[in-house]
């Protein structure tokens, strides 16, 4: 089963296999249930505490027929993937430069580059090159971002 290039929103418990590129976007929480920890040690050389019994109570055991996020890909515009009470995530697939307006948004914004390279420039003129596998967080004071494309770029945009 190949899910290369698939976007999905898995709302509950999960595990991550080798070779996966995962953008784990989630609501704020101070809870982590560690089920298996690969025998890692804490700063004192002890194995870290596992939360096997607690995690069993938190797992949603229902099975989804299709957990992929279905959307119609579009070039050079925002396509919303997920909106929930905790965050909104959209995908941009750009071959042209774009200025994105955040003047009405009262949130930080995160870009996660999935393919290609671009230069992002905020309203104050601060610029940074963003490549596949890299992320950038813009503070809530950012009013606009100019994305200068170098051929093609695909990135996720997330805000609360």
Language-model regions: role of each:
Residues 96-123:
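Glycine- and acidic-residue-biased ligand/ion/polar-headgroup-sensing regions
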